[in-house]
Amino acid sequence: MAQFFKAKPNSSKQLSAKLSLSVNQLDHLGAGIAQHQGKVVFIPGALPDETVTVQLTEQKKNYARAKLIKVDTPSSERVEPECPHYHTCGGCDLQHMSLSGQREHKEAALLDIMAKFAGAEGGTLSPALTGEGWHYRRRARLATLFDKNTKHLSLGFRAASSSNVVPISQCQVLAKPLSDLIVPFAKLLNQLSAKASLGHLELIAADNGHFAVLRITKALNDKDLAKLSAFAEQHLIHICLQDNEGQFQGVGAELVLPVYQLLGDKAESDAVSLSFTPGNFVQVNGQINKAMVAQALDWLAPAPDERILDLFCGMGNFSLPLAKMGADVIGVEGVAEMVTQARVNAKANNLDKLTFYHGDLSADLSLEPWMGKIDKLLLDPARAGAFESLQWLKKMKPRKVVYVSCNPASLARDSAVLLERGYRLQQLGLIDMFPQTHHIEAMALFELTK
């Protein structure tokens, strides 16, 4: 049988060609969208209302991807990125857009996803929770890369969609005291005899000081420990080591746990604080986390003796303040270590109307003897959402549901389930937890109507 040559869609001739395209919108991941020969073309770094020169990098049946070569006609929202590492580091992807433009885009994207996939067009759009656009991160993990040829250890962040480490000298979204430690730490780590055995470095800015967690794959000798101890004393920072088993050891002093305030000031009687073990999940934007907790309290309006269920409760980010307001709170978390720390936090805050349980949140927890009647519900799941949990929660019929989401796609899917079960979307608001990036977080309030 005769066979005829058919050009592959990703031929080198097609991909090497440069095109001039007009960008009309952003996708939900922050890439510009243009049209070419009936296809949608995604262009990272391009903004709406721009004319750009691009080079195709990938051709599919219904879409293509392109690399931005030049901005021919810039958008009024285009700004010069503040970070010198922006074009190589994979941490931020919207520094080229004004902060107001970023927030307008995120809010529009949130509404679009909710309307398209949940049919949730009602409710009141609440003002976005916003804060500082720079130096807002109180926690970051830096990667290390040891070059066997040069014997040099690089410290930085991963490049976008790559395992390569981009050495950095500063980070414009990291808390300034932590950013200022990057270069000194890079010099210190290169002075250690065990530098080939070092893993990531985590930097934390807490209310009780600054912390560094250094991952090690083998024990350090006394000389290396002495250098770390001297560095900690010089820079007024707590340093701890994390070994292969995940155990932590303080350097030059006993291990101190970082502490964050959730409500009020630590000197106030109504203050609530949260301590955590390095490695546990906490919200990296402290300013926005406080605003988020306050909004959740306002929307749920906990009353004394109401029973509130907090699913995916972590170490008590919402449970602790809810209990402080007088409600009886049940917190359920799937990670046993975080449940242990949540109980420590409840005791430290003198909260006795609060109980934490470790459980599989995809299982039917309504059958547990401790569950009982639930008046209100708070959900704060990971990116996968709470679809499995919502299957058994229909038995509980809480009057109010506050859903805190770090993924609008799973929020929309789960919202559709709640709407089908007689809930009405009352409030929806953007949470700008990660300025200078495309990431969208949101909070939604649902009330039972039937």
UniProtKB/Swiss-Prot annotation:
GO terms for biological process: rRNA base methylation. CDD domains: AdoMet_MTases (cd02440). InterPro entries: 23S_rRNA_MeTrfase_RlmD (IPR001566), MeTrfase_TrmA_AS (IPR030390), MeTrfase_TrmA_CS (IPR030391), NA-bd_OB-fold (IPR012340), SAM-dependent_MTases_sf (IPR029063), TRAM_dom (IPR002792), U5_MeTrfase_fam (IPR010280). Keywords: 4Fe-4S, Iron, Iron-sulfur, Metal-binding, Methyltransferase, rRNA processing, S-adenosyl-L-methionine, Transferase. S-adenosyl-L-methionine binds at residues 283, 312, 317, 333, 360, 380. One of its GO terms (molecular function) is rRNA (uridine-C5-)-methyltransferase activity. The keyword DNA repair does not apply. [4Fe-4S] cluster binds at residues 83, 89, 92, 171. The keyword Iron applies. Its EC number is 2.1.1.190. It is an enzyme of class 2 (transferase). It comes from the Bacteria. Residues 12-70 form the TRAM domain. Belongs to the class I-like SAM-binding methyltransferase superfamily. RNA M5U methyltransferase family. RlmD subfamily. This is 23S rRNA (uracil(1939)-C(5))-methyltransferase RlmD.
